[in-house]
């Protein structure tokens, strides 16, 4: 067969000739590519010299042991601490010192809160003493005073009070739990425990600050708000140390007051009350985090200004209520002079205490303030001008007006002493427990 044979016997090229627009009719013994080889893109002579891809290269590096991050595989309740592996690529099973520092701060806070609880305990004791007309000194309690205290404790704990119980304060302090159980089998242990609480309200408070050294009050500019608040509480605690360290020695070594609790065995309770100094309330001492004291009202300022001149006996007397009708009966008579309400008590008096005193004498002061519901502690100010005038006379302030007095009332909302009743009425307020007793 020759080159010009039948078309069916010829094999044409699959693509046009280079630089030609017509199909070649020449028979060729080989198949041509669709495009000419580009040496710049692909060199046929370099096929055997192609560089391998990095991923295809054999690994000649030494094999390293695999480190697993055990941070998330540890038990949640494990007592050790794993430090951040970004900082150190090791496992640290020692306790982080920062945690220990945090625990120390928590301990300091617990001590502060413990002191706050003791302060409230002292206030509750003083309230009960004023309510029952009890002297501040256990050693001055007569058998009638002891009977009042026992009956009050039985009422608080729903116990059946004993009959014909005449025990003086000195005898109470010397009674053991078995002695209490003899006079009250069903609740003698409760009365004995409550007596120890009353002792703790005085002795533990003194011991809490016996060895406390006031810190430097200068604060750094970089102190956080939380640190500033803690520092203010610490300074408040420090302010009480100088007062408690000035207590005198025992006046009567034959009657130790704190011998039951192991503190100050040579100090009688009377010397404690006479030589001690009133301590400011924490709610009155705290200021805002920026150091301002704009929330201080007239009632609070009086408390701070009179701290150095007011004895601890006045603290017990004034932190509770004013002289109750029971106290007036014990003293023999109840005066009719209006000025008696303003002169019979020395030391600092809070506004809420003053209002309670007026409420307890409705015959003289019902035109000024009266009870709306005695059981609920709701009262109404009938004459704000008259109340402000009486309060100004009590505080010896001729410029006292109801605007200043109302600021003190509003401060009591924050302190949990007074609030507006659910059904709001003008000049109607409500004492909150335990101030409504």
From Swiss-Prot:
The modification Phosphoserine is found at residue 73. Disruption phenotype: Delayed larval development and increased lifespan, but overall resulting animals have normal morphology and fecundity. Reduced egg-laying rate, but older hermaphrodites produce more progeny. Both decreased expression of genes, such as the lipoprotein vit-5, which is related to life span regulation, and increased expression of genes such as lys-7, which is a lysosomal protein. Reduced expression of genes such as svh-2 in response to axon injury and as a result, there is reduced axon regeneration of D-type motor neurons. Residues 280-293 have a biased composition (Low complexity). Changing residue 73 to E: Phosphomimetic mutant which may allow for association with cebp-1. Suppresses axon regeneration defect in mxl-1 background mutant but the suppression is abolished. PROSITE patterns: ETS_DOMAIN_2, ETS_DOMAIN_3, PNT. It is found in: Nucleus. May interact with cebp-1. May interact with tdpt-1 to facilitate its sumoylation. This is Transcription factor ets-4. The gene is ets-4.
């Amino acid at each position: 067969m020759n080159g010009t044979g039948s078309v069916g016997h010829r094999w044409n090229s699959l693509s046009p000739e280079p630089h030609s627009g017509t199909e070649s009719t020449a028979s060729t013994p080989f198949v041509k590519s669709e495009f000419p080889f580009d040496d710049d893109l692909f060199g046929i002579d370099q096929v055997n010299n192609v560089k391998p891809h990095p991923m295809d290269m054999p690994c000649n590096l030494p094999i390293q042991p695999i480190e697993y991050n055990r941070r998330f595989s540890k038990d949640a309740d494990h007592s050790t601490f794993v430090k951040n592996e970004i900082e150190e690529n090791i496992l640290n099973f020692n306790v982080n010192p920062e945690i220990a520092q945090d625990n120390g701060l928590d301990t300091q806070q617990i001590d502060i809160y413990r002191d706050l609880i003791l302060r409230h305990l002292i206030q509750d004791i003083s309230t009960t003493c004023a309510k029952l007309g009890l002297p501040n000194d256990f050693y001055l309690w007569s058998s009638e005073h002891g009977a009042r205290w026992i009956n009050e404790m039985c009422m608080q704990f729903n116990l059946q009070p004993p009959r014909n119980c005449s025990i003086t304060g000195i005898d109470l302090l010397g009674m053991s739990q078995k002695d209490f159980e003899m006079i009250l089998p069903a609740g003698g242990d409760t009365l004995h425990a409550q007596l120890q609480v009353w002792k703790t309200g005085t002795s533990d408070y003194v011991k809490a600050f016996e060895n406390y050294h006031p810190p430097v009050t200068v604060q750094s500019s970089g102190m956080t708000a939380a640190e500033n608040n803690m520092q203010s509480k610490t300074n408040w605690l420090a302010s009480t140390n100088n007062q408690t360290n000035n207590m005198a020695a025992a006046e009567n070594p034959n009657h130790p007051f704190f011998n039951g609790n192991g503190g100050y065995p040579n100090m009688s309770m009377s010397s404690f009350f006479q030589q001690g100094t009133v301590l400011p309330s924490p709610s009155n001492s705290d200021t805002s985090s920026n150091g301002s004291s704009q929330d201080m009202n007239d009632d609070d300022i009086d408390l701070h200004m009179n701290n150095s001149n007011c004895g601890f006996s006045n603290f017990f007397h004034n932190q509770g209520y004013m002289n109750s009708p029971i106290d007036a009966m014990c003293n023999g008579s109840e005066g009719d002079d209006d000025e008696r309400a303003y002169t019979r008590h020395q030391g600092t008096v809070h506004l809420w205490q003053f209002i309670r005193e007026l409420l307890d004498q409705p015959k003289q002061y019902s035109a000024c303030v009266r009870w709306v519901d005695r059981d609920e502690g709701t009262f109404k100010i009938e004459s704000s001008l008259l109340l402000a005038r009486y309060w100004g006379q009590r505080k010896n302030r001729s410029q006292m007006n109801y605007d200043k007095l109302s600021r003190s009332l509003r401060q009591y909302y924050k302190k949990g002493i007074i609030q507006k009743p659910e059904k709001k009425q003008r000049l109607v307020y409500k004492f909150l427990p335990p101030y409504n007793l």
